[in-house]
């Protein structure tokens, strides 16, 4: 009986996992509108922190983040760029097949309504217009210079900033984003084994 239950659990888990991956393979289908305010919980190898998102700060960013968290995109993602006194960045999926589908799934830029103060979370972008996709960063300190270059925060850490502060930082900016995108978690696990990562991210309310 126990064996049958265990087998059923494995089948259900496998089916759920395949369903989640299937959803993440189609960015254009994940366009649910986020609530005016919501909380996302991040369970990581460093501990737990919570993000309170304010959709009116940056609607495009808030909607994208909501869909990514809700559909498990950030689960397993490493904190690959950690610069003490500046930011901690994450959001490249560990599965290259999924990552490829999101590289061109950009969202429009929007005005900076809330400053990049300590504990705020913001989508990363390049110098090109409308280049935000999945990568986000949390500000370790007040980074007002980012306000002038169009980085629009969409939320803030409401608990667990002490956890964010202790995310492993010794590798700095050494992990190569291009290799993470093409090789995924395998590259990071082999070359940067001490990186902290997200075990599970969920929408709480």
What is the meaning of each model-derived region?
Residues 1-7:
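Sec-dependent signal peptide recognition
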Residues 9-17:
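Hydrophobic h-region of N-terminal signal peptides that target proteins for export
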